[in-house]
Amino acid sequence: MHAAERIRKAGIACADVSIGSTPTALSAQNLDGVTEVRAGVYVFFDLVMHNIGVCQTEELALSVLTTVIGHQLAKGWIITDAGWMAMSRDRGTQRQRHDFGYGQVCSEAGDWIDGARVTGANQEHGIITLGDTCHADLAALFPIGSRLRILPNHACATGAQFPHYHALDANGAVHTWSRLHGW
């Protein structure tokens, strides 16, 4: 509001006062005079917002459904069909309190798999590792064809990769939402 007041005092009309960012949208105490709030990832939240305390894990609403397509057992890798074309190359959590690699791995139902992260991303393939957790038989735990969900570091960068979203409502019905293109 201070900038708008200074602009107006200089004799320039300033009808629109716009603020941005998800943390601002959630913490603002007084929006008097603000005509627009651009809340960023507010609708979905993401791992960056989770790391700074803006949201809880159960509030993360965007995920990418992926399929296990292979393994490199000697390296401890689970290979999926969701690479950086699906997830983006955003490593926004790498300097935060918890680094999620390229994304947090969950079961198809959305339950976190502790220690499982997307640690590598090629164009079409993601590489999941289980961190320090020792699993003798990755192929048995995550067989080819099994599906997982990946929670993104940055919902904007990931969401922009897709022309539409499949939204699940409280009753379990799936709806398709078309994405608006452009900023």
Predicted regions span which residues?
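General structural feature for long, well-ordered alpha-helical segments within catalytic domains
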Residues: A3, N30-G33, V64, E124, ...
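Small-residue-enriched segments and motifs
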Residues: T66-T67, A116
